[in-house]
């Protein structure tokens, strides 16, 4: 079992080898790249990311994934906007990172590796709505705001409506959603309805 300092806890994990790099996304839309060889070994107590990165005041890391130069990634914010970015455009050489997604008043939500052009995106909002769309419908940008993935107007955003989850689905995968004591299955052949 891992032990944490007071106020700390588990956030996420990512499978990355020591000769690879990790891409991190902060909630303010900035991305950072860390060489795994620079991280302390698992035998110690670790080291705060803030000692290796220059995070802006009040921002926090919300997503991490293996960085590959030839890879493609889906990045999204909780206002429902997102786009596809190439691995080359995601790479940051500096401790201060680079601006990736223009969030405005929103917060960055997700950074996930796209495995195939056939992958689909499942987007969920905090009102319980679900939408499935082909990932290839998103624009490929180096940075910016992107397109609307799930509809959230400025008025709805001001009232608290947010996209709170985004999941990349392989082409023929079934989906099982749970909410409290209810569950809903979406079979691959039924995805067109969503």
Predicted regions and their residues:
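Short, structured "edge-of-domain" segments at secondary-structure transitions
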Residues: 1-194
């Amino acid at each position: 079992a891992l032990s944490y300092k007071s106020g700390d806890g588990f956030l996420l994990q990512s499978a990355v080898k020591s000769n690879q790099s990790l891409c991190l996304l902060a909630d303010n839309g900035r991305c950072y790249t860390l060489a795994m060889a620079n991280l302390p070994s698992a035998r110690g107590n670790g080291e705060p990311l803030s000692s290796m990165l220059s995070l802006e005041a009040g921002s926090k890391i919300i997503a991490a994934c293996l960085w590959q130069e030839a890879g493609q990634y889906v990045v999204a914010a909780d206002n429902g906007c997102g786009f596809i970015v190439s691995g080359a455009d995601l790479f940051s050489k500096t401790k201060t990172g680079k601006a990736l997604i223009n969030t405005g008043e929103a917060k960055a939500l997700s950074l996930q590796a796209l495995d195939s052009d056939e992958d689909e995106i499942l987007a969920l909002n905090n009102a319980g709505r679900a939408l499935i769309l082909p990932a290839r419908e998103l624009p490929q940008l180096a940075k910016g705001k992107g397109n609307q993935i799930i509809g959230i107007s400025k008025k709805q955003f001001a009232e608290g409506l947010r996209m709170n989850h985004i999941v990349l689905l392989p082409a023929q995968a079934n989906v099982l959603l749970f909410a409290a004591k209810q569950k809903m299955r979406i079979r691959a052949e039924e995805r067109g309805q969503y």
